[in-house]
């Protein structure tokens, strides 16, 4: 297939040296992504990965292997995998560079190793806080020969219990082949949190005849520390009870609020933005998507085709009747976007209690030639985020459904408008402007979108049409996710009918959504990966050269959109994680938030 490149066999794990990953990873996603091998450059077939360095030997290789067994990896980080540090003399520097966090309750580490010929070793340890942890102990000699048969040695990491501290442990293993002067040094990094032990209250004493008295906890008088403890518990319970009542009242109050305060400034400014390099759309066949597994399975929703069209206009109006306002409170100004039958206006909303107070708003409406089905779909799809409150969501606040008037949907105003149009404007602006949108800004936008989607996932709300076209932005670069009402009309090139009389965002959809019409938070994660790609390309259309009818087969074969120009490997790895064929192998939105936040902080360190 033209314009396509491959990244090896699909279905392999992102974790180097790991096989058969199934269970969810508890460590942060960025730590797993840090172990990813470098991805190939866009538009080129993946070159063979550079061969890892081998153990130095003057003759045939000694075939040394050292790894963590599947049981050990599962015990430490919850993955069903073997983690190799050395496999048949090949050293995995990705695995060695990872500072593994040891659970605080774990005191022993087990390493599996063997060699086919004579290899001498020397073992040493360093601890950065000897007050918190004793020097590690091993159940083998610190110097000797690597066993010729498969063996396991144990390292004991015991805390002293004297102080609270995170301890950094370095285990250094020197391997020498055939007693030569050449040797290989392997450094294993571990982290463990040690805690201070609570002193036990001594309750036994000797009587005058040196006989031991028996302590009776039932009849013994309470000590001062015991009384203080129970008083503290009582005070804490009372405080928690009061806080719970206050939170419940605030929650009920917020749920009753219909009108959201909109403090967005009315002034807009044109920010100078740089023009990125143009690129030809290319595609990759990626094995990287099959990586970070989620903590739990995703709830799946099967959507029947044309289910929105089964709702009548009367029913749609009935669902929004409680937030309906008078048409007189809305003043329409400029047309921001216009399609075949739909429009989005910049409007002014007059306050119900004080006519002198005005707020800016988005107003979605339809033209006179709009059909009843189109009007119904606008009202129904506008309710997707209704009643949800999050700083990165933009739900509707009011509607106008008066008889004889075309329905209007009102949303809070964001003065830089639609995110996709904003990104494309960034591409068109010349590079000589004083200000330019940075890669760090784009990552910050992605974090905000991931935060909003994480909130939806916790509320078990499936968006089903996440894309840059369904987000808005203001002059502070705050991004909010909106519904997809009128998107089919305003962005017709992003939707395609595959013979079922239903326009769908084919290029943003996961394979299970395309083939089986199944939607879940996992399919939203897939769409987020495409949205992240949109951000990094400043609004380009994904898979633009692929026939929509061939998308399902294309994705099933393992092909994905190529890495954007100037997109860091780590960021493209995040996208690739979102495009795993198996929904269970895609990361959770909360993992994506954490990963992108860490990456954003790393970018800031270089600015």
UniProtKB/Swiss-Prot annotation:
Residue pairs linked by disulfide bridges in the UniProt entry: 159-194
GO cellular component: cytoplasm; glutamatergic synapse; membrane; nucleus; plasma membrane; postsynaptic density membrane; presynaptic active zone membrane; receptor complex
Catalytic reaction(s) noted: L-tyrosyl-[protein] + ATP = O-phospho-L-tyrosyl-[protein] + ADP + H(+)
Effect of residue 364 to A: No induction of the MAPK pathway
Annotated TM spans: 228-248
GO biological process, alphabetically ordered: axon extension involved in axon guidance; axon guidance; axonogenesis; canonical Wnt signaling pathway; cell surface receptor protein tyrosine kinase signaling pathway; chemorepulsion of dopaminergic neuron axon; commissural neuron axon guidance; corpus callosum development
Annotated keywords: ATP-binding, Cytoplasm, Disulfide bond, Glycoprotein, Kinase, Membrane, Nucleotide-binding, Nucleus, Phosphoprotein, Receptor, Signal, Transferase, Transmembrane, Transmembrane helix, Tyrosine-protein kinase, Wnt signaling pathway
Subcellular location: Membrane; Nucleus; Cytoplasm
Chain spans, region Disordered: 1-20, 266-290
Signal peptide: 1-25
Domain WIF: 66-194
Biased composition (Low complexity): 266-282
Enzyme class: transferase
Domain named Protein kinase: residues: 330-603
Pfam family, one: PK_Tyr_Ser-Thr
Description of post-translational modifications: Proteolytically cleaved, in part by presenilin, in response to WNT3 stimulation. Cleavage occurs during neuronal differentiation.
Residues at the active site: 465 (proton acceptor)
Residues of this chain annotated as glycosylated in UniProt: 139, 174, 178, 182, 209
Binding site for ATP: 336-344, 364
Residue intervals on the Cytoplasmic side: 249-607
Modification Phosphotyrosine, positions: 495
Membrane topology category: Single-pass type I membrane protein
Domain remark in the UniProt entry: The extracellular WIF domain is responsible for Wnt binding.
Family assignment from sequence similarity: Belongs to the protein kinase superfamily. Tyr protein kinase family.
Quaternary structure annotation from Swiss-Prot or TrEMBL: Interacts with DVL1 (via PDZ domain).
Record protein name field: Tyrosine-protein kinase RYK
Species of provenance: Homo sapiens
Gene this chain is encoded by: RYK
């Amino acid at each position: 297939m033209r314009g396509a490149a491959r990244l090896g066999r699909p279905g392999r794990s992102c974790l180097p040296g790991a096989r058969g990953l199934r269970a969810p990873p508890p460590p942060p996603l960025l730590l797993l992504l840090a172990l990813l091998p470098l991805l190939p450059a866009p538009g080129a077939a993946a070159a063979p990965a550079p061969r890892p360095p081998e153990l130095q030997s003057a003759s045939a290789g000694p075939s040394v292997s050292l790894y963590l067994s599947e049981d050990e990896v599962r015990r430490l980080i919850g993955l069903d995998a073997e983690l190799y540090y050395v496999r048949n003399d090949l050293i995995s520097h990705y695995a060695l560079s990872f500072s593994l966090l040891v659970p605080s309750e774990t005191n022993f580490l087990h390493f599996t190793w063997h060699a086919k010929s004579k290899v001498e070793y020397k073992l040493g340890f360093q601890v950065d806080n000897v007050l918190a942890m004793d020097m590690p102990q091993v159940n083998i000699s610190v110097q000797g020969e690597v066993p010729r048969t498969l063996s396991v040695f144990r390292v004991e990491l015991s805390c002293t219990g004297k102080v609270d501290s995170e301890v950094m442990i370095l285990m250094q293993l020197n391997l020498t082949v055939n007693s030569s002067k050449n040797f290989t040094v392997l450094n294993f990094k571990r982290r463990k949190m040690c805690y201070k032990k609570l002193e036990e209250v001594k309750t036994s004493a000797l009587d005058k005849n040196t006989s031991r008295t028996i302590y009776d906890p039932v009849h013994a008088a309470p000590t001062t520390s015991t009384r203080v403890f129970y008083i503290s518990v009582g005070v804490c319970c009372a405080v928690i009870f009061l806080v719970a009542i206050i939170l419940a009242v605030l929650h009920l109050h917020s749920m009753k609020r219909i009108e959201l305060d909109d403090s967005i400034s009315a002034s807009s400014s044109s920010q100078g933005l740089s023009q990125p390099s143009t690129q030809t759309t290319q595609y990759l066949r990626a094995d990287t998507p099959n990586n970070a597994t989620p903590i739990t399975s995703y709830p799946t929703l099967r959507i029947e085709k044309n289910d929105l069209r089964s709702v009548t206009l009367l029913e749609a109006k009935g669902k929004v009747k409680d937030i309906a306002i008078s048409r007189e409170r809305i003043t329409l100004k400029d047309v921001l976007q216009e399609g075949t039958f739909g429009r989005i206006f910049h409007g002014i909303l007059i306050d119900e209690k004080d006519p002198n107070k005005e707020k800016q708003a988005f107003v979605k409406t339809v033209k006179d030639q709009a059909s009843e089905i189109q009007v119904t779909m606008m009202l129904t799809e506008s309710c997707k985020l209704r009643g949800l409150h999050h700083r990165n969501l933009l739900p509707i606040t009011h509607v106008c459904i008066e008889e004889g008037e075309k329905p209007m949907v009102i949303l809070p105003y964001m003065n830089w408008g639609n995110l996709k149009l904003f990104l494309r404007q960034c591409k068109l602006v010349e590079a000589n402007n004083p200000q330019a949108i940075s890669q760090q800004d784009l990552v910050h936008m992605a974090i905000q979108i991931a935060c909003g989607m994480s909130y939806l996932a916790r509320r078990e709300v499936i968006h089903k049409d996440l894309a840059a076209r369904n987000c808005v932005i203001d002059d502070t670069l705050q991004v909010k996710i909106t519904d997809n009402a009128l998107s089919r009309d305003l962005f017709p090139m992003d939707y395609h009918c595959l013979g079922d009389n239903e326009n769908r965002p084919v290029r943003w959809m996961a394979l299970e959504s395309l083939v089986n019409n199944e939607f879940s938070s996992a399919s939203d994660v897939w769409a987020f990966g495409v949205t992240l790609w949109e951000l990094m390309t400043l609004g380009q259309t994904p898979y633009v050269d692929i026939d929509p009818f061939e998308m399902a087969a294309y994705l099933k074969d393992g092909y994905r959109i190529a890495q954007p120009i100037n997109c860091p490997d780590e960021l493209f790895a995040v996208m690739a994680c979102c495009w795993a064929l198996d929904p269970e192998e895609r990361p959770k939105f909360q993992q994506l938030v954490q990963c992108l936040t860490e990456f954003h902080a790393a970018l800031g360190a270089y600015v």
